[in-house]
Structures are given as C-alpha cells and as structure tokens.
A protein has these predicted regions:
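ATP-dependent carboxylate-amine ligase
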Residues: 1-138
Length: 138
C-alpha cells in the first residue's frame, strides 16, 4: 500500500478533538471533498480554518464565493485566514445567511489557532483546508 500523502485529508487526534489536515494545495474539487468528509462526522462541532483557494485565474472570486456557501451548509464555525484574501469566502458565507457570531476572520494562522482554542470542545472536528504562505496574508 502507498503511504498517505502528508497534509492530504489526514485525520489525526489532537487531545480530545480531531483534525482533518487538508492543508496541501487546495482546489475546488478537493475542497468540496474535504467538506464532505467533515460533514460525515456525526458528533461534535464542525470547524473549518481556511484562507481559501488561490491561482484559479479569472474564476477565483466565484469559486471561493461558492466554497463559502458550501462551508456555511456544513460548518458550525468558520475561521477565515487573511482579511483581504478571504473576502470572496466571506461574501459567500454571508450570502448563505450564516450566523455572524460563528464566523471569524483572522489575520494569520496564529490568530486562527487562538480563535480555535476559544471555540473548540471535546469531539469537535477541525478541517484545515489549504495553507498559504504569509505573503498572501496581511
């Protein structure tokens, strides 16, 4: 059997909650599949941390907007990373009438992790979807 690829839908325990690490290079099909995996967990809060997708050309805004709507259907909490870059995701989440008190925008991954620490609880499942270098964040 082939070993799993690092940061490709890797499920791992983190104390009393779980992490789905899908931080390696996100694309629309992969991001949707990762959300399906997250949705399949019955118990616990479903949380996503993502900066969105990059290098999608002229459809980048639209594809991220749509992903925002998909996240709103599945996630109990959404933590976006990078205020400027995550705007299309934010717009998609808002368009889906997602509760604002469950939506957070972090400047960087450290701030996202701090926010996560405030909301995570036992049996939560946290999806890390894509990981951008700090050059994309402000």
């Amino acid at each position: 059997a082939l070993p799993p690829i690092e940061h490709r839908l890797q499920l791992r325990p983190a104390g009393d909650y779980f992490i789905i690490d899908d931080a390696f290079n996100s694309n629309p099909a992969g991001a949707a599949a990762a959300l399906e995996v997250l949705a399949a967990f019955g118990e616990g809060k479903k949380i996503i941390i993502t900066p969105g997708m990059v290098e999608l050309g002229e459809r980048e805004y639209q594809l991220n907007f749509e992903f925002g709507g998909q996240m709103a259907q599945v996630c109990d909490y959404i933590i976006l990373v990078g205020k400027k870059h995550s705007k299309p995701l934010y717009d998609g989440v808002i368009a889906a009438n997602y509760p604002l008190e469950q939506l957070f925008v972090a400047a960087d991954l450290n701030e996202a992790r701090s926010q996560l620490a405030k909301i995570v609880e036992p049996a939560s499942v946290v999806l890390f979807e894509n990981d951008l270098p700090d050059t994309y964040n402000e």
